Amino acid sequence: MEKWWFNSMLSKEELGHRCGLSKSMDSLDPIDNINSNENMILNFTEKSIHSWSNGSSYSNLDLLFIIGDIPNLISDETFLIRDRKGETYSVYFDIENKIVEIDNYHSFSNYWNSSYGTGSKSNDTHYDLYMYDTKSSLNNHINGCIDSYLHSQMRLDNYVLRDSDHYGDNYIFDDIKTTTKTNGRDKNLEVTKKYRNLWIQCENCYELNYKKLLKSKMRICDECGYHLKMSSSERIELSIDPGTWEPMDEDMVSTDPIEFHSQEEPYKDRINSYQKETGLTDAVQTGIGQLNGIPVAIGVMDFQFMGGSMGSVVGEKITRLAEYATNQNLPLIIVCASGGARMQEGSLSLMQMAKISSALFDYQSNKKLFYVSILTSPTTGGVTASFGMLGDIIISEPSAYIAFAGKRVIEETLNTTVPEGSQEAEYLFDKGLFDPIVPRNPLKGVLSELFRLHAFFPLNQNSIGQ
């Protein structure tokens, strides 16, 4: 663990908005961190740090809390807090596991209640802290503060305060410094690797997005609006009304039909490892549910499972879904995210293209039902050459990578240069390859309107059984 100290100074309005405090921060002294390599008997000497109550003026101060520091700060660390009465408290944070432990908790609780219980309360009752009389509620509040702070600060890289005589009333200044007895750069790298599962880097602008908040934003990058990859479960949750999802053929698994030989890892072992990693049996989830009350049959491919490759199980599940939708007169949605046919199953994977296309022919041409294909990044290979491009309406996500063969394969095979961006959704849209480009935010509403236009209306009851 590293030794941290920082001087945190917030205005009453700013702090009250972020963490629900109704008092200024001059009641708390600078916060220190216990280094695990140091003597645990600490000397709390006064530090010559300007307090907020000094009324000191600051000009052109850089906000040093940059995005790269956040993964280091939110590791499992122990901080020492000293109040204005001289009492000290040891607070241990494990943000990843949501653990907050307070040493000398009784004194800390008394100070907390005396400081914030009898004083003036904020105008917004949601932020009053006089109610916090249990460790559980305090833990929840602290975790809520951290989430709120990260949410509001994560897009800030370097912020320079404007020239003003009243910085104390309007701005936040966090000066975070690290001192360590080991190599600081190596230590930071170690901490970053340890907690990188808390952050997701945008593939387009390379900014970090806080994983916990990213899901609520439909996995759309805060900085550039790029649509990051989603799991099949997240897409189902995004599109299907809560409590209406009924999965189909969940127990269907591949049996290594051609006994594919691999020197690195047997096919069955690879399947098993992806099943454990994703919780899925194969690269597609199929089922029925309601979309804004409208009964639908939906299949969602998952790129996290062997690159969304299409084998015999994927082909069979989608075929059965199309046949079920045909028999029940349901609209059909297939969300594509695939690298193409699965080479470990040879020609059996290729024949899935014809099998699915045959089922869709009966669904569309004979039954005159409505099939919507949604292309996400990436959609390539055998999926593009079959059911991905057979929709009555073909929708693409923004900036999706859509192709039959990859850029490298084309260039090596044809000995020609593939123009940059020629396999992206916007370029292909101009060429008429599909219909609309729809972002994730309005997608559910767009699908609902399309279904209504084709005479599919919501049910009054919750069940979609016929």
From Swiss-Prot:
Keyword presence, ATP-binding: yes
Substrates-to-products reaction catalysed: N(6)-carboxybiotinyl-L-lysyl-[protein] + acetyl-CoA = N(6)-biotinyl-L-lysyl-[protein] + malonyl-CoA
Localization in the cell: Plastid, Chloroplast stroma
GO MF term list: acetyl-CoA carboxylase activity; ATP binding; carboxyl- or carbamoyltransferase activity; zinc ion binding
Keywords: ATP-binding, Chloroplast, Fatty acid biosynthesis, Fatty acid metabolism, Lipid biosynthesis, Lipid metabolism, Metal-binding, Nucleotide-binding, Plastid, Transferase, Zinc, Zinc-finger
GO CC annotations on file: acetyl-CoA carboxylase complex; chloroplast stroma
SUPFAM superfamilies: ClpP/crotonase
Name of this protein: Acetyl-coenzyme A carboxylase carboxyl transferase subunit beta, chloroplastic
Annotated source species: Fagopyrum esculentum subsp. ancestrale (Wild buckwheat)
Gene: accD
